[in-house]
UniProtKB/Swiss-Prot annotation:
Coiled coil: none annotated. Belongs to the universal ribosomal protein uS4 family. GO terms for biological process: ribosomal small subunit biogenesis; translation. It comes from the Bacteria. This is Small ribosomal subunit protein uS4. GO terms for molecular function: rRNA binding; structural constituent of ribosome. Residues 1-46 are annotated as: Disordered. Residues 94-154 form the S4 RNA-binding domain. One of the primary rRNA binding proteins, it binds directly to 16S rRNA where it nucleates assembly of the body of the 30S subunit. PROSITE patterns: RIBOSOMAL_S4 (PS00632), S4 (PS50889).
Length: 205
């Protein structure tokens, strides 16, 4: 397991929230952050602090994206017509690794990135090994034949803690998903409140 993958629980502790809604999250048992200073009482955040926290939470949710990559996604959302915050969510949910996670092909978004990177997924019949690959409405995402019996896949499809959202159609018998449409914020089944408008405010300072 990579260091970035093993850090997933640290993200929960850092945020003080169970951001993926997982039963084993350590924040279900403790109310302070990671590290030796985690138990210190937290003061009231400034406006900047609130905006930064919203950004860090959204970055963390999608696999602790690197700042350069997340900023590039925001910049594209800002260039597009319409509401920048909604555009940002749509772009993040259009990532191949996000769709693999939403389709319940794997148990976590970290596993989804590794699964894609290791060549286990195809889009419209072509192998794609880039987690940030942007899917379009109508794209068909499939677990490649040689990977369909992997234990991680079989276990993930049985997870009861989350459902497949209605903007993705899935056949778990064939391990095929269709990205029906780009979702809006209200469509996305976040386990906690996400505030992309605060992310827009952060980058607009």
């Amino acid at each position: 397991m990579s260091k970035r993958a093993s850090s997933k629980y640290k993200i929960d502790r850092r945020m003080g929230e169970n951001i993926w809604g997982r039963p084993k999250s350590p924040v279900n048992r403790r109310e302070y952050g990671p590290g030796q200073h985690g138990q210190r009482r937290k003061g009231k955040l400034s406006d900047f602090g609130v905006q930064l926290r919203a950004k860090q939470k959204l970055k963390g949710y999608y696999g602790d994206l690197r700042e350069k990559q997340f900023r590039a996604t925001y910049d594209e959302a800002n260039r597009r017509k319409g509401d920048t915050s909604e555009n940002l969510i749509g772009l993040l949910e259009s990532r191949l690794d996000a769709i693999v996670y939403r389709a319940k092909f794997v148990p976590t978004v970290f596993a989804a990135r590794q699964f894609v990177n290791h060549g286990h997924v195809s889009v419209n019949g072509v192998k794609v090994n880039i987690g940030s690959y942007r899917c379009k409405a109508g794209d068909v995402i499939e677990v490649r034949q040689k990977s369909k019996q992997l234990a991680i896949v079989l276990e993930a499809t049985q997870l009861a803690e989350r459902d497949v959202p209605d903007y993705i159609e899935v056949d778990h018998n064939k391990m095929v998903a269709t990205f029906v449409r780009v979702p809006t914020l209200s469509d996305v089944p976040y386990a906690v409140i996400m505030e992309p408008q605060l992310v827009v405010e952060f980058y607009s300072r």
